[in-house]
Design a protein with these regions (language model features):
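Acidic/polar-rich alpha-helix caps and helix-coil junctions
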Residues: 1-201
Length: 201
């Protein structure tokens, strides 16, 4: 079952990807979504106000290239509209938005704490990188890094997440590959393993 909003978002994205511009229907659908949500229907103002260099969203990228501001705003509209419906990961896979993590790790960051927010807390807040630290230190940047607060730990996520090309597709089970072979030999199977995944269990 499709939500009407998702069908409209799909049309908007497909229209823009195909034509490089929004047709009258795509613009109308976008304004309808925003009107129903109680948000300004001036999509051109939203697009003009977007600075991609300030966006930390994975949706800014297709592969390792930044998309343009209109396509990004369509993606952001999708993210907001389908919030908490379990679609975001599939969208990011569809757009190949994790490619930059193949060559460089991504470190999750939270709130901008070290500009001014820290002033609202006790002066003795522990941020020294030890096991007693409650937040990541200022030397790591202004934004809190939840997995980097304890620099003494062997936490594998401390230095960030990485991604592998294989993760864009799920592996096919070896038993399924064998089942599709008359002699149960994976080399004679009608089903092939997805790229970058092994054929041994």
């Amino acid at each position: 079952v499709f939500r009407t909003a998702e069908a409209l978002l799909n049309y908007m994205e497909a229209c823009y990807e195909k034509n490089g511009t929004l047709d009258a229907d795509a613009r109308k659908y976008w304004m309808q979504l925003r009107e129903r949500a109680g948000v300004s229907t001036d999509i051109d103002a939203t697009i003009a106000a977007t600075d991609l260099s300030k966006e930390k969203d994975f949706g800014v990228y297709s592969g390792t290239s930044m998309v343009d501001v209109t396509l990004y705003n369509i993606r952001r509209e999708r993210m907001n509209e389908l919030f908490s419906e379990g679609q975001r990961f599939a969208d990011l896979i569809h757009w190949r938005s994790f490619d930059r993590m193949i060559t460089a790790k991504w470190i999750p960051e939270g709130v901008n704490f070290w500009d001014n927010l820290y002033l609202l807390y006790d002066a003795d807040i522990k941020a020294d990188g030890t096991s007693d630290a409650v937040v990541s230190g200022k030397e790591q940047g202004n934004y809190l890094r939840p997995y980097s607060r304890n620099l003494e730990s062997s936490n594998e996520l401390r230095d960030g997440y990485n991604w592998h090309e294989a993760y864009y597709l799920y592996p096919i089970g070896i038993s399924d590959i064998r089942t599709a072979s008359a002699d149960r030999d994976i080399n004679n199977s009608n089903i092939y393993q997805n790229i970058n995944w092994p054929t041994t269990a």
